[in-house]
Amino acid sequence: MPELPEVETIKNNLQEILPLRIKELEIRREDILRCRDYALEELTGQIIEEASRRGKYLILAVDNGLFLVFHLGMSGRLYIQEEETTVLEPHVHVIIHLDKRLKLLYQDARRFGGLWLLKDTQCFFSRLGKEPLSEEFCPRYLEQVLQGRQTAIKNLLLNQNLISGIGNIYADEALFMAGIRPDRQAASLSVREIEGLCCGIKEVLAKSIKYRGTTFRDYRDGKRQPGEFQNHLQVYGRFNQACPNCGQPLKRSRIGGRSSHYCEKCQQ
């Protein structure tokens, strides 16, 4: 699933070419449209002024105050293509025809993602937790979030209502960087461990953005290029390989229904 760094990378790709005028919004599969606050025709002739991100959502702001909000689900791609390209790959469900002979395509084979046409985003995003790369996300905030929680720290990091944008890959990587086992009870972390985890989260996300995200199979950026952070992963997807710190074989276990990768020696 595309996580914060992957969506941030696509956002950055789009920001490079905006603003662009919408010529037509083409919905090729109705069930991919999760919410429609306004008619499609209201977008015709309007200008996409800005791309932004909230958690794992990508937001396109239109000059008449409307918003197009995308979530890429498990396998979604959002990329720019020249208008002259007439052959479409399978599972392209949304096409935004733009000026400058361009079009923006949303492709999603598994259809866990979608598009929301919204007049306001404040209510839509009101339940999302803090952005981990923001100044507001600090050790004090993380300490408040962890206080009294008996769940595994890995599960807490994946809770989008508490921290927005972190998924399985970056939770494992941040916990390894902080030296914390993914199955540790959240409330058991010391102040020093919380500080280390906060730094680890910010560092691993920033590094992944630098390398344009992680590609194992589906993910491509807004230019249809794979990310490169998979070449820099320390633990995720490296079961039974040597720990980069101590050399012991890395472990894998199921926590909250998801695979977690860690070092039994380096993480306590």
Swiss-Prot record:
<feature type="active site" description="Proton donor; for beta-elimination activity">
    <location>
        <position position="56"/>
    </location>
</feature>
<dbReference type="GO" id="GO:0003684">
    <property type="term" value="F:damaged DNA binding"/>
</dbReference>
<dbReference type="InterPro" id="IPR010979">
    <property type="entry name" value="Ribosomal_uS13-like_H2TH"/>
</dbReference>
<protein>
    <recommendedName>
        <fullName>Formamidopyrimidine-DNA glycosylase</fullName>
        <ecNumber>3.2.2.23</ecNumber>
        <ecNumber>4.2.99.18</ecNumber>
    </recommendedName>
</protein>
<keyword id="KW-0863">Zinc-finger</keyword>
<keyword id="KW-0326">Glycosidase</keyword>
<dbReference type="InterPro" id="IPR020629">
    <property type="entry name" value="Formamido-pyr_DNA_Glyclase"/>
</dbReference>
<keyword id="KW-0234">DNA repair</keyword>
<dbReference type="InterPro" id="IPR015886">
    <property type="entry name" value="DNA_glyclase/AP_lyase_DNA-bd"/>
</dbReference>
<dbReference type="Pfam" id="PF06831">
    <property type="entry name" value="H2TH"/>
</dbReference>
<feature type="zinc finger region" description="FPG-type">
    <location>
        <begin position="234"/>
        <end position="268"/>
    </location>
</feature>
<dbReference type="InterPro" id="IPR035937">
    <property type="entry name" value="MutM-like_N-ter"/>
</dbReference>
<feature type="active site" description="Proton donor; for delta-elimination activity">
    <location>
        <position position="258"/>
    </location>
</feature>
<dbReference type="Pfam" id="PF01149">
    <property type="entry name" value="Fapy_DNA_glyco"/>
</dbReference>
<feature type="binding site">
    <location>
        <position position="91"/>
    </location>
    <ligand>
        <name>DNA</name>
    </ligand>
</feature>
<keyword id="KW-0479">Metal-binding</keyword>
<feature type="active site" description="Schiff-base intermediate with DNA">
    <location>
        <position position="2"/>
    </location>
</feature>
<dbReference type="GO" id="GO:0006284">
    <property type="term" value="P:base-excision repair"/>
</dbReference>
<dbReference type="InterPro" id="IPR000214">
    <property type="entry name" value="Znf_DNA_glyclase/AP_lyase"/>
</dbReference>
<comment type="function">
    <text>Involved in base excision repair of DNA damaged by oxidation or by mutagenic agents. Acts as a DNA glycosylase that recognizes and removes damaged bases. Has a preference for oxidized purines, such as 7,8-dihydro-8-oxoguanine (8-oxoG). Has AP (apurinic/apyrimidinic) lyase activity and introduces nicks in the DNA strand. Cleaves the DNA backbone by beta-delta elimination to generate a single-strand break at the site of the removed base with both 3'- and 5'-phosphates.</text>
</comment>
<dbReference type="Pfam" id="PF06827">
    <property type="entry name" value="zf-FPG_IleRS"/>
</dbReference>
<comment type="similarity">
    <text>Belongs to the FPG family.</text>
</comment>
<keyword id="KW-0511">Multifunctional enzyme</keyword>
<dbReference type="InterPro" id="IPR015887">
    <property type="entry name" value="DNA_glyclase_Znf_dom_DNA_BS"/>
</dbReference>
<keyword id="KW-0378">Hydrolase</keyword>
<feature type="binding site">
    <location>
        <position position="149"/>
    </location>
    <ligand>
        <name>DNA</name>
    </ligand>
</feature>
<dbReference type="GO" id="GO:0034039">
    <property type="term" value="F:8-oxo-7,8-dihydroguanine DNA N-glycosylase activity"/>
</dbReference>
<dbReference type="InterPro" id="IPR012319">
    <property type="entry name" value="FPG_cat"/>
</dbReference>
<keyword id="KW-0456">Lyase</keyword>
<dbReference type="InterPro" id="IPR010663">
    <property type="entry name" value="Znf_FPG/IleRS"/>
</dbReference>
<dbReference type="GO" id="GO:0008270">
    <property type="term" value="F:zinc ion binding"/>
</dbReference>
<dbReference type="GO" id="GO:0140078">
    <property type="term" value="F:class I DNA-(apurinic or apyrimidinic site) endonuclease activity"/>
</dbReference>
<comment type="subunit">
    <text>Monomer.</text>
</comment>
<keyword id="KW-0862">Zinc</keyword>
<keyword id="KW-0227">DNA damage</keyword>
<feature type="active site" description="Proton donor">
    <location>
        <position position="3"/>
    </location>
</feature>
<keyword id="KW-0238">DNA-binding</keyword>
<feature type="binding site">
    <location>
        <position position="110"/>
    </location>
    <ligand>
        <name>DNA</name>
    </ligand>
</feature>
